[in-house]
Amino acid sequence: MQRTLLLAKIHNCTLTGANINYVGSISIDQILLDKSGILPYEQVQVVNNANGQRFITYAIPAPAHSGIIELNGAAARLGIIGDRVIIMTYGQFTSEELKSYTPTVVIVDEKNRPLEVRRYDDLLSQV
């Protein structure tokens, strides 16, 4: 049996743009992708704290150190500049893989600069 658990999260980002004319996706500062382990074109779930919207799209890299978090395409209608969002990916794990499971959470400031990277390597030790 496989279980679906959080793999990575970028917490409390600030939307810096919304481009309805782009093909789709969410642009994320390359530094945040690197620190979280989220890959370009990986499926992500985005939660908008301002309006409660939850949606799925895919990540594309924005220039490193740019602070860019930008909704593209149809997703651009689901948030406005200044909204705070959470970006998450999930993975499927077997019972054996769960023994080494470690989700990564990147906490950012209001300019989308990483403040802290948390790895919860003992999360399932009590399960």
Swiss-Prot record:
Cofactor note: Binds 1 pyruvoyl group covalently per subunit.
Keyword entries, A-Z: Autocatalytic cleavage, Cytoplasm, Decarboxylase, Lyase, Pantothenate biosynthesis, Pyruvate, Schiff base, Zymogen
GO BP annotations, alphabetical order: alanine biosynthetic process; pantothenate biosynthetic process
GO cellular component, one term: cytosol
Keyword Cytoplasm annotated: yes
Main enzyme class: lyase
Record InterPro entries: Asp_de-COase-like_dom_sf (IPR009010), Asp_decarbox (IPR003190)
PTM summary: Is synthesized initially as an inactive proenzyme, which is activated by self-cleavage at a specific serine bond to produce a beta-subunit with a hydroxyl group at its C-terminus and an alpha-subunit with a pyruvoyl group at its N-terminus.
Gene3D superfamilies, sorted: 2.40.40.20
Lineage per the UniProt record: Bacteria, Bacillati, Cyanobacteriota, Cyanophyceae, Nostocales
Cross-referenced CDD domains: Asp_decarbox
Subunit: Heterooctamer of four alpha and four beta subunits.
Enzyme Commission no: 4.1.1.11
Species, as recorded: Nostoc sp. (strain PCC 7120 / SAG 25.82 / UTEX 2576)
Sequence positions bearing Pyruvic acid (Ser): 25
Protein name: Aspartate 1-decarboxylase
Co-factor(s): pyruvate
Chain sites annotated for binding substrate: 57, 73-75
Pathway: Cofactor biosynthesis; (R)-pantothenate biosynthesis; beta-alanine from L-aspartate: step 1/1
